[in-house]
């Protein structure tokens, strides 16, 4: 596999991995044996929020001594949103984003020495549809390829009524498969929490106007039932899409970053 490296900004590097428009932007940490986090921005599996849920997150993690990798995974893209061409043509759809995350995990592990990170300390963090993507890693990937920890922030979780985010379902499944009940069920994450699931740090807000907050409620219940070590921060206010942007959300929801860092240290990876 050929990897193309270009300079993105002074403190980051963008690498093209896998197929299509898949890119990984690295924000290297300064110390040795660092923790690494692969960040998956949201966007309903149609596009990416590369600012609040991508670059802002990468810079924030880097400042904390964490090596961040922001993943531009394959999405359906805007033409698929405004038309229904995927009724005829395949386009980008499941399992493309999942395959891209799997490839990113493999890449970071293979280049752990280069980035001065520990292969045993590579976690994943995702926002909205990206939260669904990172949580699906332990349900769809072989156990030996699991991340060390998972951070879904205001995630899409279920693909079935009544709490489904329909735009994300359409983006992931494609127009020709949105009615496939078996596929919907298999990608409803609350139904398939595996034994030995890595620790999870879950965040959402009750006033989320985009992804119904019950998505996180059912995930929390499933994690509890499977005795998965996890933290669930459920804020009253904050809405959706705040990521690591200090100008978005509410004062209370923006504390999630501080709580995450405390939790991460408690894992003693």
Q: What do these predicted ranges mean?
A:
Residues 11-35, 94:
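N-terminal cap/lid segment of alpha/beta-hydrolase-fold proteins
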Residues 196, 202-204, 208:
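Short beta-strand/loop motif that positions the catalytic acidic residue
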């Amino acid at each position: 596999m050929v990897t193309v490296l270009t300079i993105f900004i002074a403190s980051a590097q963008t690498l093209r991995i896998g197929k299509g428009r898949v890119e990984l932007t690295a924000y290297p940490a300064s110390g040795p044996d660092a923790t690494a986090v692969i960040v998956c921005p949201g966007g309903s599996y149609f596009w990416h929020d590369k600012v609040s849920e991508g670059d802002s997150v990468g810079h924030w993690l880097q400042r904390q001594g964490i090596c961040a990798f922001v993943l531009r995974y394959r999405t359906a893209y805007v033409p698929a949103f405004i038309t229904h061409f995927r009724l005829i043509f395949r386009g980008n759809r499941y399992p493309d984003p999942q395959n891209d995350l799997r490839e990113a995990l493999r890449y970071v592990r293979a280049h752990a020495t280069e980035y001065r990170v520990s292969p045993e300390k590579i976690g994943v963090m995702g926002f909205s549809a990206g939260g669904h993507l990172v949580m699906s890693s332990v349900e769809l990937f072989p156990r030996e390829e699991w991340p060390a920890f998972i951070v879904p922030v205001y995630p899409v979780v279920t693909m079935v009524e009544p709490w489904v985010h329909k735009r994300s379902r359409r983006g992931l499944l494609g127009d020709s498969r949105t009615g496939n009940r078996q596929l919907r069920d298999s990608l409803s994450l609350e139904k398939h929490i595996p034994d030995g699931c890595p620790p999870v740090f879950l965040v959402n807000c009750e006033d989320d106007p985009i992804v119904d907050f019950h998505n996180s409620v059912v995930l929390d219940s499933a994690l509890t039932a499977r005795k998965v070590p996890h933290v669930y921060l459920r804020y009253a206010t904050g809405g959706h899409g705040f990521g690591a942007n200090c100008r978005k959300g509410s004062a209370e929801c923006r504390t999630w970053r501080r709580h995450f860092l405390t939790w991460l240290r408690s894992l003693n990876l």
